[in-house]
């Protein structure tokens, strides 16, 4: 199982939100580059970065920070948030980003998604963020009428190989992942699933591992030391 330490960027800082609400932010580190280096030194094998400002604006507003992180660490970096054109995808890949996560664009611009998947194959990941079972977009501000299961099936049919699934109600709560929704998703599609939102303990990670979930994104639990990164990496290697 892959462990993805999370770095959420807002106004150039590393922050955490509560249930996706931008008014409920906590600054975890004023220097995201330093935070990335910390995670790498603790043994992280890949980083998950979200440009929160970009998710709302529809374009990367923390690009320079992302570029600095890519230059500062030797491990792969995957990035999401506001990536809605091929030019934006290419720009990120050109500075060393390993994989790009498309969210809003996956729902509203299928032709762009298809072209991106055709050109970049497994480097394109789709992020499905759900609230009460329905897909949320534009930085979680808009709620669509499409279920997360329906969108996941569409993405699989278009050749997407990996999905990041986030239950917004769990994000930043340390209340545990939404195992029920993840189980339904797993039964509905046959592609890689990365779980995000609510992970609070090594027990949560073990349960996801037992479910054969491909990866898990961990944010608040690492920053608040509910989970020790070195320990969870060791545990997942032994499983």
Curated annotation (Swiss-Prot):
The active site is at residues 8, 129. Pfam families: His_biosynth. Keywords: Amino-acid biosynthesis, Cytoplasm, Histidine biosynthesis, Isomerase. The keyword Ribonucleoprotein does not apply. It catalyses: 1-(5-phospho-beta-D-ribosyl)-5-[(5-phospho-beta-D-ribosylamino)methylideneamino]imidazole-4-carboxamide = 5-[(5-phospho-1-deoxy-D-ribulos-1-ylimino)methylamino]-1-(5-phospho-beta-D-ribosyl)imidazole-4-carboxamide. It is found in: Cytoplasm. Transmembrane segments: none annotated. GO terms for cellular component: cytoplasm. CDD domains: HisA (cd04732). One of its GO terms (biological process) is L-tryptophan biosynthetic process. It is an enzyme of class 5 (isomerase). Disulfide bonds: none annotated. GO terms for molecular function: 1-(5-phosphoribosyl)-5-[(5-phosphoribosylamino)methylideneamino]imidazole-4-carboxamide isomerase activity. Pathway: Amino-acid biosynthesis; L-histidine biosynthesis; L-histidine from 5-phospho-alpha-D-ribose 1-diphosphate: step 4/9. Gene3D superfamilies: Aldolase class I. Signal peptide: none annotated. InterPro entries: Aldolase_TIM (IPR013785), His_biosynth (IPR006062), HisA_bact_arch (IPR006063), Isoase_HisA-like (IPR044524), Isoase_HisA-like_bact (IPR023016), RibuloseP-bd_barrel (IPR011060). Its EC number is 5.3.1.16. PANTHER family: 1-(5-PHOSPHORIBOSYL)-5-[(5-PHOSPHORIBOSYLAMINO)METHYLIDENEAMINO] IMIDAZOLE-4-CARBOXAMIDE ISOMERASE. NCBIfam families: 1-(5-phosphoribosyl)-5-[(5-phosphoribosylamino)methylideneamino]imidazole-4-carboxamide isomerase (TIGR00007). Belongs to the HisA/HisF family. This is 1-(5-phosphoribosyl)-5-[(5-phosphoribosylamino)methylideneamino] imidazole-4-carboxamide isomerase. The lineage of its organism: Bacteria, Bacillati, Bacillota, Bacilli, Bacillales. The gene is hisA.
